Amino acid sequence: MATHEEFIRTQVFGTVFEITNRYTDLNPVGMGAFGLVCSATDTLAQQPVAIKKIMKPFSTAVLAKRTYRELKLLKHLRHENLICLQDIFLSPLEDIYFVTELQGTDLHRLLQTRPLEKQFVQYFLYQILRGLKYVHSAGVIHRDLKPSNILINENCDLKICDFGLARIQDPQMTGYVSTRYYRAPEIMLTWQKYDVEVDIWSAGCIFAEMTEGKPLFPGKDHVHQFSIITDLLGSPPEDVINTICSENTLKFVTSLPHRDPVPFRERFKTVEPEAVDLLEKMLVFDPKKRITAADALVHPYLAPYHDPTDEPVADAKFDWNFNDADLPVDTWRVMMYSEILDFHKIGGGDGQIDTSATFDDQVAAATAAAAHAAAVAQAQAQAHSNSSNSNSSSNVNSKSKAARDSANDAITNYGNQAVHYANEFQQ
């Protein structure tokens, strides 16, 4: 079993990184709302990696569920154009670390340094659509596709990352999720009832930005964003307006003066016709008339790279049964531990649940394991209490400490199996 001594602590931007000695040379490369990302060297594989620390994943049930979702997606989605999970571990402080390939830069940074030549625009768009074809075939929507979520290495290999916002293809989806410039109009117009087509819109915006070197729809706010979209596409058609669910949004849209669309060939005069044709098929107001990733791959513009024998789909749909679950933190904790153990092919531990079982069965097993841990903690705390001298303040302090330690030992005993792999796999 891994001990605290098997992990090395270091401060990065005031944040404690607690990793095994397999990983060295930590340098910060990015900071998100829920985690810090560092580059590092994997001394076992002899290659650079990115390590994302999920801070306090078990502090709330919402954060625990979000982390569980991201882990499940990273385990399920395995494709050349998606960032792939190489390692995952739980530190003694119960932070979770995801280890993935390290790409040299992202598309956002690349676009700020120089304009892209035609062949790079083609190749990057091809890889984006190739990745989306796979993601969508798995029943997953990225929802936050933007240049900073598209990673590129020195060989121009492209990988889509950050599936933290990814969701099921669900007929009733709500909320603002994607960065405004790349947000599909159906998200702005309805805030629900959207599908995989939102990713195609985002990819179209990225395509235009790669072509022109600047964002196509740089909206200052929600209203301005919609306005500059209609500057190009014209007013939304009636069948799109009829899908608007928000009464206020409907009043706003119908109050606007009618606008005629600008022909794409006039707006993009310096762009080759085949590129303009594909872009026009991606940026369509009606999501049901928007081209799919699979169809876009066979478009003549991408002919130099299209290979129907090497554009795979997912082996199975992603299981979203957990998505509506409202579970306590300790249940999510046990399920997370089991996923980590499963990733490292470690089995046979006490209470370990079968990650291939139905979600309901997993929840039942995880709930039982968490309840058992709590019962053990309570029994051990009571035993300490009975054997202590209640009149001694030092004993009272010892008793409280023993109870805390007992509870911690009980609930983390299950999870220590997840830490255990450090001995077997990281040396």
Swiss-Prot record:
Modification after translation, per record: Dually phosphorylated on Thr-174 and Tyr-176, which activates the enzyme. Phosphorylated during osmotic stress.
Predominant subcellular localization, coarse grouping: cytoplasm
Pfam families the UniProt entry points to: Pkinase (PF00069)
Regulation (activators, inhibitors): Activated by tyrosine and threonine phosphorylation.
Residue positions binding ATP: V29, G30, M31, G32, A33, F34, G35, L36, V37, K52
Modified-residue entries (Phosphotyrosine), positions: Y176
GO BP annotations, alphabetical order: stress-activated MAPK cascade
Protein kinase domain ranges (all copies): 23-302
UniProt GO cellular component terms: cytoplasm; nucleus
Keywords: Activator, ATP-binding, Cytoplasm, Kinase, Nucleotide-binding, Nucleus, Phosphoprotein, Serine/threonine-protein kinase, Transcription, Transcription regulation, Transferase
Compositional bias segments (type: Low complexity): 380-400
Required cofactor(s): Mg(2+)
Enzyme class: transferase
Active site residues of this protein: D144
Family: Belongs to the protein kinase superfamily. Ser/Thr protein kinase family. MAP kinase subfamily. HOG1 sub-subfamily.
Entry protein name: Mitogen-activated protein kinase HOG1
